[in-house]
């Protein structure tokens, strides 16, 4: 009887360690970024990643220039290439400088009478490393409205994500990362950067 019990425990131990080895070979798993929705997205997005001006015009804005950047990953931590990234935010005065998509919103949050070139919206496409970046400005801060931007990521193979980016000191980049336009770096030094790595539900790698 003791021999039978010993053999059973031995085989069970082999199965446990065998399963653990298989687990170690699995792809990494990233925590999926949660959705936080915003009702103030624009009716029409500007088609550039520079929110400080329209394409072909000079920039004239009132506030501090910043970079918003990071990586888009799938749930296996694989960088997502060619994802469409939409960003929108209020300007220095706390208002959105465009016409909203939705009609049942607080109209006092919008303005079309500013002499600033700040557009409040833009679009970027991730590179082959899953990286994106936007040129923007630090939004208005008050007891009622915190400094944040809104982002939506779309990819044909992944679940669309919409969330909020809190522009707090804790989210500032620790070091230089990602590919940024050399023209921007040459003309402006020490631009405050906020980094956000976002994870979408789904996988981009095909199984064969």
From Swiss-Prot:
Transmembrane annotation, as ranges: none
InterPro entries, sorted: Intradiol_dOase_C (IPR000627), Intradiol_dOase_core (IPR015889), Intradiol_RC_Dioxygenase (IPR050770)
PANTHER family: DIOXYGENASE, PUTATIVE (AFU_ORTHOLOGUE AFUA_2G02910)-RELATED, INTRADIOL RING-CLEAVAGE DIOXYGENASES DOMAIN-CONTAINING PROTEIN
Record's keyword annotation contains Oxidoreductase: yes
One function term, GO molecular function aspect: oxidoreductase activity, acting on single donors with incorporation of molecular oxygen, incorporation of two atoms of oxygen
Keywords, in A-Z order: Dioxygenase, Oxidoreductase
Known EC number: 1.13.11.-
Superkingdom classification of source: Bacteria
Family per similarity comment: Belongs to the intradiol ring-cleavage dioxygenase family.
Name of the protein in question: Putative dioxygenase RP396
UniProt xrefs under SUPFAM superfamilies: Aromatic compound dioxygenase (SSF49482)
């Amino acid at each position: 009887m003791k021999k039978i019990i010993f053999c059973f425990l031995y085989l069970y131990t082999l199965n446990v360690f065998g399963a653990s080895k298989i687990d170690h070979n699995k792809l990494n798993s990233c925590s999926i970024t949660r959705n936080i929705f915003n009702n103030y997205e624009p009716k029409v997005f500007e088609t550039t990643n520079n929110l400080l001006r329209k394409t072909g015009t000079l920039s004239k804005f009132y506030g501090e220039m910043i970079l918003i950047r990071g990586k888009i990953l799938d749930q296996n931590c694989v960088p997502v290439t060619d994802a469409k990234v939409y960003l929108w935010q209020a300007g220095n005065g706390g208002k959105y400088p465009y016409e909203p998509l939705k009609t049942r919103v607080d109209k006092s949050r919008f303005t079309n009478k500013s002499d600033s070139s700040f557009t409040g919206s833009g679009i970027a496409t991730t590179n082959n490393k899953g990286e994106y970046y936007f040129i923007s400005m630090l939004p208005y801060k008050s007891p009622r409205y915190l400094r944040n931007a809104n982002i939506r990521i779309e990819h044909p193979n992944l679940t669309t994500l919409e969330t909020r980016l809190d522009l707090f000191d804790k989210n500032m980049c620790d070091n230089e990362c990602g590919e940024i336009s050399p023209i921007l770096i040459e003309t402006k030094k020490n631009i405050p950067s906020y980094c956000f790595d976002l994870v979408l539900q789904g996988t981009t790698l095909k199984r064969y």
